[in-house]
Amino acid sequence: IGIVEEEGRLPLKRGPKALQQNGMPFYHLTKKGLIVALAIDSISERRRILKGIVNEANDDEKQAFEIMAKLVKIAPHFAFSVFERYVKAYCENKLNDIVPFTVENVSKSADNSAQLQMELLEGFSKLSKSDRDQTIDFLKKID
């Protein structure tokens, strides 16, 4: 599925003769692999990975990755949950491929939770300042 690619081989001085002659392979993540990495909670370098992807993105993907980078700054749990849903949608065959990572493809991966979050965001933005503060206090208490 193209998540990793062989990057090269390191020669061995000891071990099986075949490995001494051919070397031990080492690998790197492809763009698909990096997107999958963004969906895994236990990876601590997700922000750095996203920054690297944004810098390398082509014109088709640049907008979606830049928006995601902004969301990671203000709402990291939400933003990384978008990557989780995106990879899950690919695993469930709702997407043909992980790349290109475009707004259109991300919208295909949206589920009920995305609609709930959008409804909350739109409603919250319409509240007065005092109502927003009360709502934030309430949500902090139930979190």
Description of each model-found segment:
Residues 1-14:
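A short, conserved structural fragment
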Residues 43-143:
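Exposed, interaction-prone assembly regions rather than primary DNA-binding/catalytic cores
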Residues 18-54:
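Short, amphipathic alpha-helical interaction segments positioned at domain boundaries
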Residues 14-18, 60:
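Charge-rich, acidic-biased intrinsically disordered regions
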